[in-house]
Every structure is written in structure tokens, then in C-alpha cells.
């Protein structure tokens, strides 16, 4: 599911930063006569991360609206807990004086940071993105230990994929199913690509945007039934995890077809995803407006659940979703979600690649999840993530530049008792990807 996905990603991937004044190299020193807005804001980032500079003095109102101070502090506290305090900014570079990259050194690692400084008069930061961490003498064992220490439950798999074979390189709880949020949309993409390969549909087919949903970055406030192509829906569903696009495709393709594709792709417990819920149906059942239906749904078998969904189609709609209930913390992530194990995701990625669909692979690669630095060792890098309160999942499919081999890196973290830290988890996955690239 994706209740807070975009905001959480904004708080980590829109974390654009700058280096510390005391440690800034001469080219970006804030006192330099030729210092730019980027240089000046970069020179303050260590103090911002360490809590020594006021949040509203550094970030523009647009950033503050997307990432409130409390969330920013929670996120940076997680980074500091994992990597130590920020100590220096290095290798700061901007081509235009406003947007650029830098390395932010912590006590236990180095982060790659993308920073956008605004214009006059105050030049406050409008974008901040930490794209990954490097750690000296890193290893799969070290990352595995840190993943094991996360509160709740977590698992991961790093594997070479060759044809239909999965060759694990490093793993923990890879056969255990986790709630994976919007990662379920890979099954929708797989079925769409399969139907197009079979000649049933074309990527250029135009269909109405028949179903709207929450957390829809692309289709928010769009008129219902706006005509769009199937390729556009797929691109939106994968690259920005648009829920309206996903629900439109689920209704178009049909639950039965997607469920059959999920089974064929090797999901180890497909009953947990049967019936295959739309995002609106899941939101509605998780919320406070359908407490009676939720109890019946979670207690029922597949047939009973399908009957309940079909029989309440006129009730389980966007207008009846209680959004307020999602503000406090995790909601029924063990029983009302979409589920897959790291092994399941690896098999799904194999199934998707087997389609030979240029369009499906391109959709996966629009947003690689970890930024350009993490992607540099890969000639292809596709990504799909998922999140809601208490749930984080990140899955990548890459072809290594060095030898042309294909790899899957996938990890999931669930905590039914508390929200999970996007920045910490993304850093761990970035390290797994970097180790797989070697």
C-alpha cells in the first residue's frame, strides 16, 4: 500500500543538502567572494543535520510543507543513529550555482547528496536528496547484521538471475512473506505486459482513467474518465506509484487475470493476495468506516473475501475512505496488505524480464529509486518500492556494466507497532546494491 509513500520519499529523497562551513573546501566555502547560493547552503548542511541550525532558516516553505520539521528530525535522527554525526562536506559541485551534488561525511559513512538552493532573496533550500551511503570495509554480513537489528521484522535477497534461475549471494528470511505495499504493482505490470505480448492489447490503446485513489502523484485531481494510454498508466503506476493508475489497470485487466499471473510468477502464498485488492478497497477496509466489514474480510477464506468485496463494490469507494485513521501508525499490516517474500520478488522480476517488453522495462527504469550515483555501475537499473505506515519495501533489477550479469536486490521491513524509517532503510538497500555491483 502507499498511504504515506510520496511524503515519506519526499522526506528522504527530497532531502537536498549542503556541506559544513568549517569543513568546506575552498571552492565552495561560504566566505568565498564567488560563493553561490549552492555553496552557501552546502556550507551549512552539517549544522542542519546535527540540529545546530534552525529548520525554517534553511528550508524554503515548499520543502517545509512537503517535509514537516518533526518528520525531518525523525529521519535525520535515524541517519545519525546508524552512521554517527555529520562531520564534513566534501566534493561539492554545482554547474549553475543552485543545484548540485556533494559528499556528506558522517562518523561511520559517507552520503551522496543532491541539493537545490532557491533564488533570491533568501536562497533557502527547496530540494534535498540523500541518494545512498558508502561505508568503509562494507560487506553483506555487515549490512545483514544491521537489517537484523531493525525493530520489527525484515528480510532481503541479493541474487544473480540467469534465465529462470535465482542464485543467492546474500539473504536473510528470503522465503518469508512481508507486507510490500505498492510493490504489488509489479504483478499488474507483468499481466499487462503479458496481455500485450499475446496481442490482446497494445501499449498505445487509449482507455478512460476509470478509478481515482489517494496518494496519486500523477492523477491527483484529474477528471474521472480522462483518456490515457496503457503505457502512460503503466509509467505512472511504476515510476511515481500512482494509485489511480494502478486501480484503473486492475479493473481493466481483471482480478482473476492478475491473480493467475501472480501464481504463474511463483508467489509462494497467493491466497494472501486473493482477492487481489485495489488500493481504494484496501484503504477502505483499513479505515474506521468499515470496521464490521474488516472483521468479516480478515476472518474469511478466499471465496468469502471475494464475495464480500463484490457485494460491497458500491460502498468500498474513494468517497467512503476515512483518511484520518491513517495518521496515527500502522493499520492491520499483517492481514490487510499485499504480500511477497524476497524470493517471490526475484521470481517476479524474472517473469517480467522474460516478457521481453521494452516498454515494461522502461517503466521500471524511469525512477531507479536510489539516484544517479547508485545507478552508475549498472547499464540498466529498474525499481519499484512500496510503503505505508509500518511497511517499507524496495526492489531493484539491474544489469551490471562490468560483465552484463543481471541481479535482483530486494528487501522489506515491517513493524506492526510503529512507523519505519525510510532514510535508514534506503541507505541499507543502497549498500546492498553497491556490494552487488562489485
Give the label of every model feature segment:
Residues 24, 132-150, 322-438:
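Structured C-terminal helix/loop/strand segments within mature extracytoplasmic catalytic/sensor domains
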Residues 23-48, 137:
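Short, low-complexity N-terminal intrinsically disordered segments enriched in polar/charged residues
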Residues 43, 48, 53-96:
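Short solvent-exposed beta->alpha transition segments
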Residues 131-177:
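Beta-lactamase-like hydrolase cores
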Residues 178-207, 409:
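Active-site SXXK
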